[in-house]
């Protein structure tokens, strides 16, 4: 009877245990925008007139690491394939626990249009499965200031708690 009770207890505890991703900290995700407006005469999302899509384009589990020195996310191949399908100037938001840290635009390196007032996302052609977050596209013009939240403390803390910060 004792053996049966011990086996039952062991099996119950084993089956009841599951990996809880929330115990690793707040999720970091990248969302496309369902609705948005631009600030007048700027390539910049108006935060007061935007909303996130229901599901993330890049889920927390698809972010493998983030390099704070060169602003690169390393993604699972499936997430990178979704990023590759985005059109030029597709707006996105980097979030922590579904709260927007910053907005930006997908700007592939072959784009002929500029985006002077926002963080931009591009594929990293030099390294596999990485996306770059840059200030402006093709760069920041003289006299333009972009609020740089790429290394926002809350974002870095969430990534650090998950062991994804490099």
Model-based region annotation:
Residues 13-25:
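Bacterial Sec-dependent N-terminal signal peptides
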Residues 4-13:
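Sec-dependent N-terminal signal peptides
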Residues 23-166:
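A structural signal for conserved, well-ordered secondary-structure elements
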Residues 2, 15, 75-76:
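Solvent-exposed, well-ordered amphipathic alpha-helical segments
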Residues 1-5, 18-19:
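Positively charged n-region of N-terminal signal peptides that target proteins for export
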């Amino acid at each position: 009877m004792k053996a049966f009770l011990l086996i039952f207890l062991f099996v119950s505890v084993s089956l009841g245990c599951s990996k809880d991703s929330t115990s690793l900290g707040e999720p970091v995700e990248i969302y496309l925008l369902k609705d948005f407006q631009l600030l007048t005469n700027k390539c910049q999302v108006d935060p007061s007139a935007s909303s996130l899509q229901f599901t993330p384009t890049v889920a927390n589990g698809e972010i493998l690491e983030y390099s704070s020195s060169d602003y690169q996310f390393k993604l699972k191949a499936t997430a990178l394939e979704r990023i590759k399908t985005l059109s030029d100037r597709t707006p996105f938001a980097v979030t922590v626990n579904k709260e927007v840290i910053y907005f930006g635009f997908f700007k592939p390196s072959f784009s002929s249009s500029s985006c002077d007032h926002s963080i931009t996302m591009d594929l990293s052609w030099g390294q596999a499965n990485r996306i770059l977050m840059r200030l402006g596209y093709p760069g920041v013009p003289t006299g333009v200031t972009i609020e740089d939240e790429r290394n926002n403390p809350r974002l870095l803390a969430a990534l650090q708690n998950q062991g994804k910060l490099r």
